[in-house]
Each structure stands twice: as structure tokens, then as C-alpha cells.
Amino acid sequence: MSGVSPTTVSHALSGHGRVAAGTRRRVEQAASRLAYRANPAARHLREGRTGTIGLALPPGAGALSYYLDLALGAARRALGVGLALTLLPDLSRPSEVAAFGLDGVAVVDPGREDPLVTELARLGVPVVTGERQLTAGTGAGPAVETDHREALRELLDHLLASGARTVALVSPPPDDAFVADTLAGYEAWCRRNGIAPLVAEVPFIGQPDQAEGAVGALLGSSSPPDAVVGVPEHSALGVAAVASRLGLTVPSDLLVASCVDSPAHAMAWPPITALDLRPDLAGARLVDALAALLAGEPATAEPVEARLVVRASTLRPPTG
């Protein structure tokens, strides 16, 4: 551009440096006419960054649609804000993360004392989390959270309105915030409604058949529940399969629901009621929180509101 130095052009387009308003407008107009786009790699180099952020999922997460949808949502948002997203493998040693040269990392469903979060804090790498870490003071930044207690309350109230009298929960141990909050919400709801809590323990990440032993004991007991809620993504499918083998009909004999929705729940027969945790939005908000942290903005994160998706598995036909 005639009469304007390369440095001034750079400052005008990047928003840095002192540039007169008129000059900035002329530079921006010229760039628009030329369809000029700044080189993000060069910009990151000037800022002393790589322009790459990491996304760490729990071990085995690739088997679950929730985490895949979250990763896709994060990737789309990263592209939109000029960042590259690297999906981190399950690292055998957390110290291996240093080799990636990441500007920051989003850790999804961190464990109670997550070694990756601890190592990132030691390295001085900015961290945000998908759900808070239960152990305080680990160095993690803001958390993108869902009010799982409130979401579960809405689901359990729906089961009660559908005729349930004894609602059991199929859940892993409370080793992360999602499960801990869900269990706490279930126990509080049971107290308010005068219902004895009934919990069957299953793995956090697994296939439907891995929950079937615990569910079989639950449904085959002398006082079986008339409604079961699965906390892990695939567990409600296991509940429905066991119920069928025991001669129980869903929803006439047993109401079945899930705390995590997936396409498999919509395609099951009958389709299974579930909480849509909106993983694509959660992924996008993780990137937003990390990008703000890298830009030196206040460490905040937008929450994600779950939605109850009612399907046939919890809608009993009218009697009489």
C-alpha cells in the first residue's frame, strides 16, 4: 500500500501498535479489496505461541458418542477462532504432554487427582476443564459445567409423574464431578420424596453388556425397582436388554432412562428417554474459555444447560 510501511500495515491489521484511525481504515479497506487474510502461523510466532491447543478425553472415550461430539464441537470452534486443535492420546506418562508444544489444554472429566492436570500446572500450561476437578488447588483454570443435580431432578420428577415408585441408579464410583454431582442429586431427590436410594455399580466407560451383571442382580431381587436410570452413556441399553431377558416389558413393567443421550438411545426399541448434555456446545465453550485465558481475559466459562428428551421408554400407556 503506497505511503504506508509494512510495520504500520501489520499493526493496523493485528490491532497492535499505535495507528491513526484513518490509516487503519485505509489499510483494512485495501486488505478487503485484495481478499487478504493474515497468516495465523506468523501471528502466533510473533506472540511466542504455536497456535495449537490440546483436548484430553478420558481413557476409552472414543467408544462413546458424547466425547466424539464434544471433540467435533471443539474442533469447529477452534477453527473459527484461528486455533489448531490436537486430540491428545491416552498418555502413559503425563510428562509426555510437554512434547506437543501446546499453548493450552482442555481436560474433559478430569479425575479426582488427575495426573495430567497436575503435570500441565507444573509446566505452566494454561488449563480449562470440562466439569470441575473435585480436588481443589490443582492449578486448573475455569470449568465448563452442567448442573447435573438439577438435570437429574427434572428426569426423576418425570419418572415419578409417569408412575415410578422405586427408582434405582446404575452408576460408576464418584471419581469425577459428573458422577459425584449426579449421585448427590439422586440421594437428595430420594430424601425429598421418601424413597430409599438403590445404586448398582458399573464401569464409567464400557459397553452395555458390562453393566448387565449388576443390573441382573438389581432387577432379579425380591424387591426390584420399577424404574432404572443409567449414568454412563451405554448403561441404559444394558438395563433394557436385561429387562427383556427377564420377561419385563419397557415401559409397562419398567421405566428406563439415561443421564447421557446418544443416537443409540433414539434408535433403540422402545426409544430411551435421556438427558441431552449438548456435547457439541460444551466442546465449543471449552475452546472459548481457553482462548480467553490465552488472551489474558478474565478466567470464566459459560455453563451448558442439559435438556430432557422424553421418549417411549418412560411413557406408560394409560390403564383401565
Regions inferred by a protein language model and the residue ranges of each:
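N-terminal helix-turn-helix DNA-binding module of bacterial transcription factors
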Residues: 1-51, 318-320
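Alpha-helical recognition/docking segments in bacterial nutrient-uptake
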Residues: 52-157
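Hinge/beta->alpha junction and helix N-cap segments in small-molecule ligand-binding domains
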Residues: 58-66, 89-93, 144-154, 170-214, ...
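Flexible loop/turn connectors
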Residues: 216-320
